């Protein structure tokens, strides 16, 4: 995860075997430059509060490989209305994050996103919780078997 990365950071990590850079707070022009210079696929992270924020995805069409719609503030406890991205129809994978919890209805997310970032939702007191991970994996299997 890179938040408005500067050249020093990019130079330090350029030899690491990342397939993707997940980038927050950059313009399409900055992302294009990073993508070309470092030959990496890009996950463009857009922080969402309202429909106006969602519409920003259009300016990144040429430079992103995966869209990540996340809540404002990079905080695990914050959420946004995931239904705001239901209308997006593009030929690129959509990922959602933002206070997704293990007990949420995964079918709802399955309808609007290709990838779910539930990282914080699988934690208890800041540590990955095996029981939550098991519950989540079982729920994924159920959704897969129903579709």
Language-model segments: residues:
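Generic structural signal for hydrophobic
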Residues: 12-13, 34, 59-61, 87-88, ...
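C-terminal helical cap(s) of enzyme catalytic domains, especially alpha/beta-barrels
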Residues: 32-37, 119-147
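Short, structured coil segments at secondary-structure junctions
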Residues: 16-17, 38, 63, 90, ...
């Amino acid at each position: 995860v890179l938040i408005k990365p500067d050249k020093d950071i990019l130079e330090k990590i350029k030899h690491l075997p990342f397939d993707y850079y997940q980038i927050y707070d950059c313009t399409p022009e900055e992302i294009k430059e990073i993508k070309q210079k470092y030959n990496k696929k890009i996950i463009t992270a857009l922080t969402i509060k309202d429909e106006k924020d969602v519409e920003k995805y259009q300016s990144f069409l040429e430079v992103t490989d995966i869209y990540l719609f996340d809540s404002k503030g990079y905080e695990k406890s914050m959420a946004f209305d995931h239904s705001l991205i239901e209308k997006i129809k593009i030929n690129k994978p959509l990922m959602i994050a933002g206070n997704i919890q293990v007990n949420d209805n995964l079918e709802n997310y399955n309808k609007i996103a290709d990838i779910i970032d539930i990282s914080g939702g699988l934690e208890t007191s800041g540590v990955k919780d095996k029981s939550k991970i098991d519950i989540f994996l079982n729920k994924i299997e159920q959704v897969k078997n129903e579709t």
